Amino acid sequence: KLFAAGEFSDTVSVIRDGKVIESLPAPVQPGGIAAVGDRYLALIAVSERVLLVYDARSNEVLGVTDAGTGPTHIETLGDEAYVADTEGDVIRRFRIGSKPVETAKVAAPGTPYGIAVDSRRKRVWVTLTATNRLIGYSVAGPEMKKFATYPTIRQPNSVTVDPGNGDVFIASRTEGQLERISPGGDGE
């Protein structure tokens, strides 16, 4: 089954075989949503500024925690979720289980927005829309360590990673462009 957050309907749709089979209640303006293995589903509620954890099998809400001053996007790696707290200029890491727990945060001045995970290399990539930058964090150890910064196209809203070679792709709605960065060294 698949899950989709309805940002303007305040629901999470459960989809099987291309059909909505259930609508789960969600907080006001659910934004980013991400699977955590096959057991949990993590959801960012933009307006309520919380992270919810659903049981992906029973569809029940298991836990809720504060997600900062303005969370917008979420990605997962293993049993951890990484959240772009756009208004707080912070990247937050949560351990996801029946009770989500914030385990780390790092400053990301410049309005962090887009976020992507490179699971093979244990990296998190974040776009900074106010400064037109891409920041790379190593998450291989207990801390999130910034290892690279790259200039980007204007208004870098979306980011994704090629899992094969680690190239990072950034999209700009403002510019209507797609930029590719092949990480090497430490960036700038």
Where are the regions that the model predicts?
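Predominantly soluble domains enriched in secretory-pathway, periplasmic, or organellar proteins
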Residues: 1-188
